[in-house]
């Protein structure tokens, strides 16, 4: 499957975040919007229908074919959505209960297929924050299902059972409380001594929480960040 993610009107409503990237490359929960589709559709490829000036950094190619699906970039993927999009026949478009376009098989699709389940659309910057807790929990389940966490140092106080560390994640002498939300530590991330974390938290690859940090409420820290 090849997904083409369309910015549509959300390119304007998500500014300034969308100045430097396509809408589907924005992060909510643990992963970007695009990665949520890729994780649920292994082996898939993707490109973007976005501003021309982004072509130097992002693939803006527009291939055609039976395996190509056009997807609204601000749409948060679920297993049911991925299945519904994959099932579209040529000329069909997936719409929500209000008739809003979600995806299509073919750029000029006109036959509506209604997706009855509720959907999450990241239309404005505040949507990324208000939906972060819900999406982070879903991402955590997807990323950790059937897997075991890498061990964390015995110097930590770990509360709850929704703490997952990828290989190479490090935490020392800190308190991690997952009873209020999942805590996901990506590869190479680090929580320095004396930090207090009350989930939910997604700490990106190579990111750091500095000495004595206090984190609470659903928080996403992207790759390579220092807090």
What are these regions (language model features)?
Residues 151-227:
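Structural signal for interior beta-strand "rungs" in well-ordered beta-sheet cores
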